[in-house]
Amino acid sequence: MDTKRVGILVVDLSQWGRKEHFEAFQSFAQCTFSQTVQLDITSLLKTVKQNGYKFYPTFIYIISLLVNKHAEFRMAMKDGELVIWDSVNPGYNIFHEQTETFSSLWSYYHKDINRFLKTYSEDIAQYGDDLAYFPKEFIENMFFVSANPWVSFTSFNLNMANINNFFAPVFTIGKYYTQGDKVLMPLAIQVHHAVCDGFHVGRLLNEIQQYCDEGCK
């Protein structure tokens, strides 16, 4: 039986439907996998403009909202146990033009978009000029978003030296571009196969596209 504790749910592996998959991808078949799609953000850009939002934090919010819907993207190893965080917060990169480096910042997730965007703006105001890699105290319950707005791409992969027990999904956003009457944007996701499969990634990517189509309604 799964056990509830403050902030987490401890998974009872003996009762988990993915027990064998988890054990396989934690041992002899340990791996991550990546998938890249070209999102249609035409409607989303219109919504962002109409509401006076900024695109980057708006898209971070969309990913955060949908990631938090699914347990497989909130999993982690904690004190030797597989757990599911009650919620996860987005970590994201901030580029510093003067040094051509970046910082890894994070903001608390809020389901309400305006509250999240306010929190994001406050964090940028406080930490945005700090050149440290981690300008803000690190927390455990995070996933990660990065942006490479200088180029578009059709494939993206992170080659991690040590993937053991790193279950947080990593998203990478590319430069958006016009194709016909649409605006498309590359989005890559990398996940650990121990906690999710192609089905889960496909469902999430389809939900992100649907949310973009509906314009944050």
Curated annotation (Swiss-Prot):
Active site annotation, chain numbering: 193 (proton acceptor)
Quickly give the catalysed reaction. chloramphenicol + acetyl-CoA = chloramphenicol 3-acetate + CoA
Which Pfam families is this protein grouped with? Answer: CAT
Enzyme class, top EC level, equals transferase
Task: Kindly state a single biological-process term from the GO annotations of this entry.
Answer: response to antibiotic
Answer yes or no on keyword DNA-binding.
no
What residues form the membrane-spanning segments? none
This enzyme's EC code(s): 2.3.1.28
| GO MF entries | chloramphenicol O-acetyltransferase activity
Q: Which family does it belong to?
A: Belongs to the chloramphenicol acetyltransferase family.
State how it assembles.
Answer: Homotrimer.
Report the PANTHER family cross-referenced here. Answer: CHLORAMPHENICOL ACETYLTRANSFERASE (PTHR38474:SF2), SLR0299 PROTEIN (PTHR38474)
Q: Give a short account of what the protein does.
A: This enzyme is an effector of chloramphenicol resistance in bacteria.
UniProt name for this protein: Chloramphenicol acetyltransferase
Question: Native species of this protein?
Answer: Proteus mirabilis
